[in-house]
């Protein structure tokens, strides 16, 4: 089966989550991704949050499928020689080390261009070079705090909150992926590679663009009418936290369903659409609200929006969340059950679509991982298990022209 990135070779100098999520997607698209790891140690996530002693952790296996792994000590002369040969043959190099780490290995961007002017260099950092935080170590929640997500997440009477979704890590990897694919297309026109940099702060901010929109509206108006604080609360000079309110001008809220007292996920998310207000009133048994001036327009509803949600909840609390969604969908109401990770892991439709897949690694055995979220008509990514540490060292070195004796000598010299 032909794949989009067949024939593309990627050197993966990434660790933890932001970089590996990017290179994993490149591998799913058919690229030959060679993960370069420290001999005897490997990616730190191989050892983090283990559920089975002395076996690669799920943290690693779920971010590194379809890759090859080699152990390489780039501090040795032989290791540097191997690195240079790999760069000569590669199309893309991706790294997410702390600033300057690749340079200290002796492979500055200028030197890499001399070795292989067609190579595309992808780099993830916490902050842009011009940021006052450029030297701050950045992880998932650091990026959420600096990118605008934390200050706008949570309830108005509580502290900032970080999202459980990987807005700082995997989201940054997906942004870099887009940049690398664009650079590959650009290389077809120019014949040359380029450097593509992605800061975690920028990636989070890009997902918070509607909050930047709201900041400008707040600066001009002094209030934001779609937020729960309007019209009875007060607004400061920055976009506030709005709890579970909808952020697109269509009010929404989390509503209780049957069993909420004991099930922490017995809820649905319910959205009120202006154009669907009549159907909404019929669905909740309030047809008189259709023409009532106090309810008939979005502007009129906002002052008592929580009273409206409370009325709707009188119905949803009597039935199962799935029954509630099935009923409300008949009225074209945007809603969804709050699904737990347990429910998602067992969902047959997600298995059928390939969004959740089961793979097998020699030592770990079978485990679940996410599949490719994009669905293509011309090919289906074949999701494979993550590599064992150094599993492909000999094969990759042989492809570079090294003999078995030379490989044995490098191992003896701790270069691999």
UniProtKB/Swiss-Prot annotation:
Q: What is this protein called?
A: Formyl-CoA:oxalate CoA-transferase
Family the UniProt entry places it in: Belongs to the CoA-transferase III family. Frc subfamily.
What switches on its expression? By the acid response regulator EvgA.
Give the reactions, separated by semicolons, that this protein catalyses: formyl-CoA + oxalate = oxalyl-CoA + formate; formyl-CoA + succinate = succinyl-CoA + formate
Query: What is the role of this chain?
Result: Involved in the catabolism of oxalate and in the adapatation to low pH via the induction of the oxalate-dependent acid tolerance response (ATR). Catalyzes the transfer of the CoA moiety from formyl-CoA to oxalate. It can also use succinate as an acceptor.
Listed under subunit, the entry gives: Homodimer.
Q: Which organism is it from?
A: Escherichia coli (strain K12)
Record's keyword annotation contains Phosphoprotein: no
Q: What superkingdom heads the lineage?
A: Bacteria
A Pfam family the protein falls into:
CoA_transf_3
Q: What is its EC number?
A: 2.8.3.16
What GO terms in the biological process aspect are recorded for it?
A: cellular response to acidic pH; oxalate catabolic process
Key words, A-Z: Transferase
The record's note on what follows loss of this gene reads: Cells lacking this gene show a reduced acid tolerance response (ATR) during the adaptation phase. However the deletion of YfdW has no effect on survival in oxalate-containing challenge medium.
Taxonomy of origin reads: Bacteria, Pseudomonadati, Pseudomonadota, Gammaproteobacteria, Enterobacterales
Which NCBIfam families does UniProt cross-reference here? oxalate_frc, PRK05398.1
Record-linked PANTHER family: SUCCINATE--HYDROXYMETHYLGLUTARATE COA-TRANSFERASE
Its annotated pathway reads:
Metabolic intermediate degradation; oxalate degradation; CO(2) and formate from oxalate: step 1/2
**Catalytic residues, chain numbering:** 169
């Amino acid at each position: 089966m032909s794949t989009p990135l067949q024939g593309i070779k990627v050197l993966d100098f990434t660790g933890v989550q932001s970089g590996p999520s990017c290179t994993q997607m490149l591998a799913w698209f058919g690229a030959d991704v060679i993960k370069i790891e420290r001999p005897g140690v490997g990616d730190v996530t191989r050892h983090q949050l283990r559920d089975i002693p002395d076996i690669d952790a799920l943290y690693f296996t779920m971010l590194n499928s379809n890759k090859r792994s080699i152990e390489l000590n780039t501090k040795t002369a032989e290791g540097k020689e191997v690195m240079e040969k790999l760069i000569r043959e590669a199309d893309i190099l991706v790294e997410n080390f702390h600033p300057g780490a690749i340079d200290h290995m002796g492979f500055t961007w200028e030197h890499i261009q001399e070795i292989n002017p067609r190579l595309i260099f992808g780099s993830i950092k916490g902050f842009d070079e011009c940021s006052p935080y450029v030297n701050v170590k950045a992880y998932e929640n650091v990026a959420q705090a600096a990118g605008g997500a934390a200050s706008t997440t949570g309830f108005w009477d509580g502290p900032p909150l970080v999202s459980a979704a990987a807005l700082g890590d995997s989201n940054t990897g997906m942004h870099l992926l887009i940049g690398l694919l664009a650079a590959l297309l650009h290389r077809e026109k120019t014949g040359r590679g380029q450097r593509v940099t992605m800061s975690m702060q920028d990636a989070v901010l890009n997902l918070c663009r509607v909050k930047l929109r709201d900041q400008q509206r707040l600066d001009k108006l002094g209030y934001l009418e779609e937020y729960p604080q309007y019209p009875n609360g007060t607004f400061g000079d920055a976009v506030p936290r709005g709890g579970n309110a909808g952020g697109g001008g269509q009010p929404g809220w989390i509503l209780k369903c049957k069993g909420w007292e004991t099930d922490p996920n017995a809820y649905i998310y319910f959205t009120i659409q202006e154009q669907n207000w009549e159907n909404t009133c019929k669905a909740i048994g309030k047809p008189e609200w259709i023409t009532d001036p106090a309810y008939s327009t979005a502007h009129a509803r906002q002052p008592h929006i929580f009273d409206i949600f409370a009325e709707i909840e009188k119905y949803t609390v009597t039935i199962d969340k799935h029954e509630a969604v099935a009923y409300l969908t008949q009225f074209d109401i945007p809603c969804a059950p709050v699904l737990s990770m347990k429910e998602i892991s067992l969902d047959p439709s997600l298995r059928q679509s390939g969004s959740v897949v089961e793979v097998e690694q020699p030592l770990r055995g079978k485990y679940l991982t996410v599949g490719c979220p994009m669905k293509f008509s011309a090919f289906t990514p074949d999701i494979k298990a993550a590599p064992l540490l150094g599993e492909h060292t000999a094969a990759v070195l042989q492809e570079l022209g090294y003999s078995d004796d030379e490989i044995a000598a490098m191992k003896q010299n701790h270069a691999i």
